[in-house]
Each structure stands twice: as structure tokens, then as C-alpha cells.
Amino acid sequence: MGEVKSDIEIARAARKQPIMEVGAKLGIPPEHLLPYGHDKAKVSAEFIAAQNEKRNGRLILVTAINPTPAGEGKTTTTVGLGDGLNRIGKKAIVCIREASLGPCFGIKGGAAGGGYAQVVPMEDINLHFTGDFHAITSAHNLLSALIDNHIYWGNEQAIDIRRIAWRRVMDMNDRALRQIVGSLGGVANGYPRETGFDITVASEVMAILCLAMDIKDLEKRLGNIIIGYRRDKSPVFARDIKADGAMAVLLKDAMQPNLVQTLENNPAFVHGGPFANIAHGCNSVVATTTALKLADYVVTEAGFGADLGAEKFFDIKCRKAGLTPDAAVIVATVRAIKMNGGVKREDLGRESVEAVRKGCANLGRHIQNVKKFGVPVLVAINHFTSDTEAEVRAIKDYVRTLGSEAVLCKHWAEGSAGIEELAYKVVDLANAGHSQFSPLYPDEMPLFQKIETIAKDIYHASEVIADKLVREQLRTWEDQGYGDLPICMAKTQYSFSTDPNLRGAPTGHAVPIREVRLAAGAGFIVVITGEIMTMPGLPKVPSSERIRLNEQGYIEGLF
């Protein structure tokens, strides 16, 4: 076996087509592509608006089982499946999220796929790309600055500085900024108060950009952001301090989807990037709805496991955007299944069919959960060289007992040729008309009951633990007209429970609610459980230690 090339070496050797040629495959005229160099472009809002009357293609969701810290290749499989569909003669577009610098320099690496199933230019996508995250960070922090400025110049809106709900953000993992005191240094610097930073991907502005239908909807949602409360507990909105217009101006270009290509020169939209453990975990509605007008098949992903990303894709994104998924693919790896079967991380390379059989309970739970939404399921076994035939067979046999099918996929090593079988089966499943999509709960269900429904039906918890303050806050929001909003659970991605170390398919556990936040602009209620943080920290040995420029000026260590 020859030397295995790194992701960045493979991406750098790619024969990219000019982005205008990629756009032409979708019928996008050159004048409606706003190029950023030769290999990436934004699609104009005018072109997008003109596609409204076209019929939609088929929508395929790629999700996963509970992952290991390294991820299970969900983006890789999304990209590979898009290439596979194009390989068998179907017109397909991939829709994925943009990468955050936090995990890129932290533990998880980039978000452009891997091996021979990547989107390119990989280095750009994983770093600054077209500046969308900078624009989102700037718009968010403009609002933060305007809040403190409003208070400094007389506080006409009577904002209670003890009840300001808007923090600041940056696109980096930095635990030192979670809780800070601002405005120190004297009268000229304003009124000292406790505040803090979240990571940009947890920003409500990010969620708004990813859920807005167009620029008008974006500005309206920005105006609906609740920045804090008065002493009588009435909400103060971003529009009350006239912040929404300037924020929308900063986001004007960021609202337009980014067009790039796969290694096999197939089109891909990379747009938006909320995390699925602390936000709703899906790429933008604009990118997805545009892709559905331009292709016969759209393959999109939702972050982390199906308990987080898929649930939010169905209950938040599809509900709000009127989308109907035709099929779902759950990505599983032998190593993640073994980890869910109790194998330690350092022992994952050794064969253990028994651990696979035990860990399949986690996969089975995800299959059953996705089917609760009325969406038919296939399983993609993302192949690793350490997998054995017996382990793969055990997964296939187990999935068959649940009325679904598992397909071994080698797209990481072979590109589209390694995922042809899955592509054919996805086409058959999506066209069979089996999808009877319905969200998990109705809009009119009380907020706390919605939380209980997710906890009991998806996580298989026995109860939700919430103190009096949380329950009263939910009732207050219902009285204020927010009772019809969906729930966005903030929870560890490593387990069905709120304990990241509780693997497999646990039952009877409790879900403790630490805090609830109203994202009135995005249009959902964030429920923070367990120890989840909206500003992550870096690991002891961050990925950044391996990233450098070599003597030729090329980046090394990015993955």
C-alpha cells in the first residue's frame, strides 16, 4: 500500500475548474456569480429570487451516531454522496456548513471533508473563506457596542444593566473570556458589569442568517433580537436602539451562499455554520432552498449525532422553512460503535465483534429516532482501514433487523467510486415516496412539554429537572406570545444523556436544565443542559501546535 496522503496534500493536488464553469453546470450566469478569486464565489440575491417558481429536487439529510472526539466523517460522507450521485448521472449539489476557527485550531479539525471526498479550496474554507464569519462576528459585536453606548448616553430605553441578555462573540475557543467584567477603568468607560464571550457559531446572529429567507426577513429577525430587560421585566429589542439596519448592512454579502466545488468538480454550497451542540447545527436555509431549485438531489448535513443535528434539522429548519426531507443517511463507523460498546479510545484499532454488537444499540436508537419523523433511513458505514469484515458484517446484520440497510462506503479512499452503491440506494429510497415527514411536536404544545418530548422520545430520559425559575421563565415567554417557538437543546454530542461519558443507548437518565434563553430573532428557545459551554476551551494539545507555513509558503498541519 502506498503512502497515505494528508487531506491538505490531496486538496492541494486537485484540478479545480474555474468557478464560473462550476456555476454554469447549475445554470448560473457569470454576472450572477460574485467571485472571490478563481475558485469560490457568492451567488447573487437577484438570481436566487428568480428561481422561486421552479420545482424542488429531492432533499437528503446526512446525520450520524454519537461521535468520537475526532468526528465520524459526516461531512466527508455528505461530499462523497454528492459526488456519487453525480457519478451515476444525477444532478446533485452538496450543502454543508462553513468551518469555525475554534475547532480548526482545537481538536476536531476543519469542516471540508476528508481524503478523496472534500470540498476545495480546503485551506480557504477552513480559515477565513469569504469573510462570512467575520461579518457575523462584526454584526453581533456592533449590537453589543450599541447596547453599552445606549446606556452610557442616558439609557433612554431604561435597560436594567443587571438583565442584559446580549454578550459578545469571537470565532475562537477561549475559556478565559467566558465570564468577564467590562467597562472598568473609570467613569469615561461606562458602567461596569459582568458579561462574557460566546463563540461566533453560538451567536443568535449566526442562527438568524441561517434561518432567514431573504435580506428583508434577515433585517426583521435582527430587529426582534431581545437584548435585555427593563426593571419591569419587559423586553428591549435590537430595533428599540435602532441597531437592526446597520447590522443588516454588515450581513448583506454574508447572506448570499458561497459556491465552491468538490475534488471531482461537482458544485457545493458552503454557507453558515452554527454548531449542533450549542445551536441548531444546519447550513443556511437560503443555500438549501436555492440548491433544491437548481438540482435533482440536494445532500445536506446536520451536526454531530442525530439526537442533536437531525432533531434540530427536522424540528427547527424544516419546520420553519417548509422543507420536506425525502431520505436520511446515518453515518456510522466501526470505531464509534465500538466506543459506544465500551472500548477505550486507545483500543479502538483492535477487532472486537462483541463490542460492535453491544455498541450497535446506539446506532439502533438513532435509526428509530429518525423514523419517528417519518423519514426513511439508510446507514453509511464510513470505512476505516482498521475495520474487519466480521465487524462490518455485524453492523449490517443488526441494521437489517430494524428494517433498514447498511452500506459500506469507501469514499475517503476512493472518492465517488467508493460510494456508488449508496448513491443508487439513496436515489431509490428518495424516489419511493416513503417519506411522511412530520415534526416531533406541534407548535401549540407548551414549551416545557416540548422539552420533555425531546428528552423522553429522543434521549429516552425518564425526566427533565428544571427549577422554579426556569419553569416560570418559560411560562412568561408563553404569556408574551413565544409559546409556539421550537426548542433548541444545548447538550453534549457524545451521549444521548447530558453526561458525555455515558455511552451506548442509556435509558432512565435525567436531563437537568441549567438555563433557558429566548432567541426571539432566530425563532427558538435555547435550553442549556448539563455542563455544555457556549464558549469552548482548547484541549491540552491543540491542533494549532501542528499548523505552520513551510519554506515554500504552504500551510502544513491543517486537516
UniProtKB/Swiss-Prot annotation:
<keyword id="KW-0554">One-carbon metabolism</keyword>
<dbReference type="InterPro" id="IPR020628">
    <property type="entry name" value="Formate_THF_ligase_CS"/>
</dbReference>
<keyword id="KW-0067">ATP-binding</keyword>
<dbReference type="InterPro" id="IPR027417">
    <property type="entry name" value="P-loop_NTPase"/>
</dbReference>
<dbReference type="InterPro" id="IPR000559">
    <property type="entry name" value="Formate_THF_ligase"/>
</dbReference>
<dbReference type="Pfam" id="PF01268">
    <property type="entry name" value="FTHFS"/>
</dbReference>
<dbReference type="GO" id="GO:0004329">
    <property type="term" value="F:formate-tetrahydrofolate ligase activity"/>
</dbReference>
<comment type="similarity">
    <text>Belongs to the formate--tetrahydrofolate ligase family.</text>
</comment>
<dbReference type="GO" id="GO:0005524">
    <property type="term" value="F:ATP binding"/>
</dbReference>
<keyword id="KW-0436">Ligase</keyword>
<dbReference type="GO" id="GO:0035999">
    <property type="term" value="P:tetrahydrofolate interconversion"/>
</dbReference>
<feature type="binding site">
    <location>
        <begin position="68"/>
        <end position="75"/>
    </location>
    <ligand>
        <name>ATP</name>
    </ligand>
</feature>
<comment type="pathway">
    <text>One-carbon metabolism; tetrahydrofolate interconversion.</text>
</comment>
<protein>
    <recommendedName>
        <fullName>Formate--tetrahydrofolate ligase</fullName>
        <ecNumber>6.3.4.3</ecNumber>
    </recommendedName>
</protein>
<keyword id="KW-0547">Nucleotide-binding</keyword>
